[in-house]
């Protein structure tokens, strides 16, 4: 595939005939972004063709031009679709809803779906390389402002997660000594701005705590609330660390990025 900021183009070569001339999936068009995912006799397409927050379309493997794309999951104003993982009997959709990442598991066998639950108010989650097609096991990574990176194995049939590996933090770190919150601040124009914060338990919430506020909004880059050992010394001295998910990133969807431009 060949991609630029505002367009994509894929070319297909059969795995069984690698010398065959590549076939263009959909010719490049300015403003048309898409990614493709092969499943049996069809493709799933993640695209901004019909919605700025992206939708999921399908087409047969023999008719791949955009005029043949059929809507599978429509675009939504409050949800940005970021990626797909395709399995034999499941489809996992990576979404960003109100700034928080979510994993939606769709079951082809009974046309049902569910979301993997996460118990913290602010966190980061993403799928790993899932290279086995015919399986009910999904691997994903999770971390938050108080939890170091953890890799999970999730059974999409039983809906159970199992820890495979958790990043070790040297120095006697105890995540139970810290707390995180997600709050909303009012912008000058009345827009609600999501903010992720972390602090050490036991501080007085009287407005007098030293605070380090971080914000970055540009190029559609979302600043996720990840774990960092660098801030632990501040938290242990009574600081509150805050990430403001300001406009310019895509935390709240494509318009959040567009509205951050001057």
Regions found by a protein language model. Give the residues of each.
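Beta-strand C-termini and the immediately following turn/loop, strongest in propeller blades
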Residues: 1-4, 14, 39, 44-50, ...
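Beta-propeller blade termini and top-face loops
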Residues: 7-13, 55-58, 220-227
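Repetitive beta-architecture junctions, highlighting loop-to-beta-strand starts
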Residues: 8-10, 20, 54, 67, ...
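Conserved blade-register residue in beta-propeller folds
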Residues: 12, 58, 102-105, 153, ...
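Multi-bladed beta-propeller domains
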Residues: 14-33, 60-81, 85, 109-129, ...
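Conserved beta-propeller blade repeats
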Residues: 24-46, 75-90, 122-141, 181, ...
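C-terminal structured "cap/appendage" subdomains that terminate the fold
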Residues: 88-144, 149-152
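Serine-hydrolase catalytic core recognition
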Residues: 125-262
